[in-house]
Regions:
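Glycine-rich, aromatic-bearing surface loops/beta-hairpins
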Residues: 215-223
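Bacterial N-terminal signal peptides
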Residues: 1-9
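Extracellular secreted precursors and ectodomains with disulfide-bonded cysteine-rich loops/domains
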Residues: 28, 33, 102, 166-168
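Hydrophobic/aromatic-rich core segments of domains that either
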Residues: 116-206, 212
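Second-shell loop/turn segments in exported
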Residues: 37-38, 54-65, 93-106
Length: 223
């Protein structure tokens, strides 16, 4: 089911509806476990612009991930004003069968859609959105949205026209684009991280972890 849901084109998930005149976007959020229910959510243009401005202030991939965790939480708060997902709590046991509860399929599907919306709006400069990941422990399995660190060349490609040259420090060694080639600590192009909103209550920042750590069981101890 998850692969079928994610096979839909991004435009199906994040297109401007009748209210799109404000620069906003409309997308579907899954809930009630296994994407049994879906609710249409309109994110206003000013909200998307504020999120974009905050993400644009990130100086490297690590800072973008930190800001992205909060952005995902904020978008779920928006969804909570228009759908039943305000009832969602961390994990599954605390949901108590409430309408609006979300399991990991709901979260991985919906969070991927939220991330793709931000990516389509040019808000991600250091990462791309990739397919969700699955981990299996004994008879249990768990899914999460995933992002991947971009190379410097790919980051430059994402700059608006003219911005790369405007920020260029031209030297004999080549081009250094301000804010694009800064050191990212241990980050390497292609490195993957989960953005897992299942671990938290509705509206709280998502948990962002290296994919390898998550696959090994990393993350808060919730059920």
């Amino acid at each position: 089911m998850l692969s079928a849901l994610l096979a839909l084109p991004a435009a199906t998930w994040a297109t401007a509806g009748p209210e799109g005149a404000d620069g906003g976007a409309r997308l579907s959020i899954c809930y009630n476990y296994g994407c049994a229910s879906e609710g249409s959510v309109h994110v206003r243009g000013p909200t998307l612009r504020r999120i974009g401005e905050r993400l644009a202030a990130a100086r490297n991939a690590a800072e973008e991930r930190e800001r992205l965790a909060g952005a995902v939480g904020g978008l779920y708060r928006v969804a909570a004003t228009q759908t039943a997902v305000a009832a969602d709590r961390a994990g599954n046991l605390l949901d108590g069968g409430a309408d609006g509860r979300m399991d990991c399929i709901d979260h991985s599907t919906s969070t991927t859609r939220l991330l793709q919306l931000l990516e389509a709006r040019g808000a991600l400069r250091f990462h791309r959105v990739v397919e969700p990941a699955r981990r299996t422990r004994l008879i249990l399995q768990h899914f999460s949205a995933v992002i991947e660190v971009l190379s410097v060349a790919e980051r430059i490609d994402r700059l608006p026209p003219g911005q790369a040259l405007a920020g260029c420090n031209c030297t004999e060694d080549g081009l250094v684009i301000g804010g694009i080639g800064e050191a990212d600590g241990d980050d390497r192009p292609g490195q993957r991280y989960v953005v897992d909103s299942w671990f938290v209550d509705n509206g709280e920042p998502a948990v962002v972890l290296p994919l390898a750590e998550w696959l090994n069981g990393g993350g808060p101890n919730v059920q």
